[in-house]
Amino acid sequence: MKKKVISLLAGLVFAVNAHAEDNALASKSVHWYIKAKVITEDIDALKAVISELVEITKTETGVTNYEFYLSENNMLYVFERYLNSDAGAVHGANVGETEAMKNIFSMLEPKEFVLFGGPYEGPWGGYIKSQGISPKLIGGFNR
């Protein structure tokens, strides 16, 4: 599971090519949710790595949310939202090969990944669809 999620995240840059859907906003915004078990005992080191990623991401104009939450039972929840697939790709290029990104995955055991804002084509589109990790919007709105 860990290798699949890491590979998926690494390749996500190429997968976030959204189509026009019934809901025009859904075809533009791209966001994902990640749940991971913290396997390091050094929470301060984890927070330092997260701070590095946050500082890099703050420079990106297409990011609307980049949030990390830590529960009392050491589950890390990450919510990322981008204006569009291009902004998601910029983010992937900016953080994808950094030491901070490599370090954070050594501290976590990914449990769940859900991508919103699809459907997606490209090299990861089939994988995302087959794993059921990109649900289709069936109602609602976003402002």
Which residues make up each language-model segment?
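Generic N-terminal leader/processing signal
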Residues: M1-K2, A15
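Sec-dependent signal peptide recognition
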Residues: K2-L8
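Hydrophobic h-region of N-terminal signal peptides that target proteins for export
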Residues: A10-A18
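Short S/T/G/P-rich N-terminal loop/turn motif that feeds into the first structured element of a domain
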Residues: H19-N65, Y69-L76, L83-A93, S106-R143
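Amphipathic alpha-helical coiled-coil segments
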Residues: A100-I104
